[in-house]
Amino acid sequence: MSASASACDCLVGVPTGPTLASTCGGSAFMLFMGLLEVFIRSQCDLEDPCGRASSRFRSEPDYEYDFIVIGGGSAGSVVASRLSEVPQWKVLLIEAGGDEPVGAQIPSMFLNFIGSDIDYRYNTEPEPMACLSSMEQRCYWPRGKVLGGTSVLNGMMYVRGNREDYDDWAADGNPGWAYNDVLPFFKKSEDNLDLDEVGTEYHAKGGLLPVGKFPYNPPLSYAILKAGEELGFSVHDLNGQNSTGFMIAQMTARNGIRYSSARAFLRPARMRNNLHILLNTTATKILIHPHTKNVLGVEVSDQFGSTRKILVKKEVVLSAGAVNSPHILLLSGVGPKDELQQVNVRTVHNLPGVGKNLHNHVTYFTNFFIDDADTAPLNWATAMEYLLFRDGLMSGTGISDVTAKLATRYADSPERPDLQLYFGGYLASCARTGQVGELLSNNSRSIQIFPAVLNPRSRGFIGLRSADPLEPPRIVANYLTHEQDVKTLVEGIKFVIRLSQTTPLKQYGMRLDKTVVKGCEAHAFGSDAYWECAVRQNTGPENHQAGSCKMGPSHDPMAVVNHELRVHGIRGLRVMDTSIMPKVSSGNTHAPAVMIAEKGAYLLKRAWGAKVURVDATWTLHRVI
């Protein structure tokens, strides 16, 4: 901490993470973005020097803990917070990154930190049928390397998926994971700020995670809703009874400020002496007895390359995400025996499904123009509106909080949407001068609509490059290798073109950008063959990776964990993140990740004799037993 006192009645820390100027592109942005960051860091609710969990940070861990949680991201922050509610349990949270930077708290900056030092910046192996226009045909996968994980980088959209997603999990041999079983755990975390609008049947107040709409939306957002209505869709809460339609989504934010899992769950736990947090420390291996298969502890490496072993009394929880959870299991000798032998990792337990079943939502960036000058949404006027009132364009994500879900002709039923629409535009993220009306180009303003496949059939895998734990994993996404994914995506493109031709959007002069995609010149523009070519050239992976530590019964050869999230064949090890999803939920995955963590922590508490609450679907965890 620095020696300078702040108006927040406690010491202001040294700046954490990348600066806003650096995330915008460097020197041309230095003056305005640098000044803006100074103003932002003077705001107590943004910098939050008194509320950060820094009192829990440890440079030296203890010798032994009751529970060790690997990964302080979307799920791991929740697990560590919930376990530390039991004062008799000593809990260690291990995070490879540092604390979240202040700039990431601002909703309009949500894309700025992708590609920065708090991003793992993963790339897939060369893809045979997707990302063909990218360098070496590799798809880019941003993943948060920071306390809070990808919940520091994501678009904050709170989408749970469809009822049928979870009913299918249960039907596949995972009792306790049907929709009515998991709804209480969605509600447990939720502090819904719009309860009068969305109702109490599916939502709740009083949880640690604020969920509500941004203070401001551009007028175009409401025009998009009217466009959806013109095509016969209703506007309503897609997290309620009906998951088909349009909405301005609720977000994990309060008063125009992002709430990552770290901010929502760890900062309220900052006074608990039984919670320790190791930052800038990578878990390199889970220590497992080769004969008894009991977990003994965790091996870690700090930012200076020093390694140590930390022992565990009860259990290790792996919450490193759909990329790093299987990676750590493989490094620990848990995985397909033949693949481990190829990289000289000693097999502790042959578990063929580790790293398999990897899948992700996939999209295509459809570009449109509207009759509006291409000026920077960020300027001193919008900055002051945010700094003084937490309102205006910086308090939201432009039109990116609008979304829609619909069923194409390839959907299992009309009530089960297989396509989600995302929107992009009016994002107040970067500016050079701060002047009102600063031109970005001489063109009309661009608007993007992204149709995303919700039920992808294509499957990839995570593997090891070597036995070196600090070498990135091998990621094979296999996007668009199943033809139905391509067909569904093309249906989505044709729908968004229809949407752009509705009366509400025609009033903005919305028109399709007809620039021919390089590599698709041989096809007639707008034909199905053209769009099939285009989606393979300019593939847009979402950041919703899942499935690589699949939950399933022991007779499923590809299952990694059971319905209690215990790793098959290993004692004292569970996985709690989106990697356990048998099939990815139909929508953004942050809300389901938090739900998985809430349910997982409940299962741990129940297994180890802590007082827990009876669960039912009416809400919720209401009686101590």
From Swiss-Prot:
One of its GO terms (cellular component) is extracellular region. Its main location: secreted. GO terms for molecular function: flavin adenine dinucleotide binding; glucose dehydrogenase (FAD, quinone) activity; oxidoreductase activity. FAD binds at residues 66-95. It catalyses: a quinone + D-glucose = D-glucono-1,5-lactone + a quinol. One of its GO terms (biological process) is pupal chitin-based cuticle development. Its cofactor is FAD. Belongs to the GMC oxidoreductase family. Essential for cuticular modification during development. This is Glucose dehydrogenase [FAD, quinone].
